[in-house]
Amino acid sequence: MNGVGVDANGEIFFQLGLSHAIGNDGEPDLVAAHKWFNLAAMKGNREAMIRRKELTNEMSPCEVSRAQREAREWIRMH
């Protein structure tokens, strides 16, 4: 867990997405990046909307579905 709560703003979620997309903690994790960009987009972050769309083009449909499920689960848990 990263300790980020539902009250976080879209910029925090966007930064988490970037971190996962470029692999700051090792290998890039596109599923996690998509999840955080999705959450940031839901908070109105336009750059996250763009990055999420770009990632979607690089991911399999299964990976996109998994990222969306993880975003919904994160919302449900927070």
Region roles according to the model:
Residues N45-A48, S60:
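Generic structural signal for well-ordered secondary structure
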Residues Q15, S19, R51-K53, E70:
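"A position-specific structural signal for the A-helix of alpha-solenoid helical repeats
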Residues N38-A40, R72-E73:
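K/E-rich alpha-helical interaction surfaces of small helical-bundle regulatory domains
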Residues G3-L16, I22-N24, D29, F37, ...:
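Short helix-capping/linker turns of helical repeat alpha-solenoids
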Residues E27-K35, C62-Q68:
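Structural signature of tandem alpha-helical TPR/SEL1-like repeats
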Residues G3-V6, G10, K53-H78:
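Terminal, low-structured helical/coil segments at or just beyond the last alpha-helical repeat
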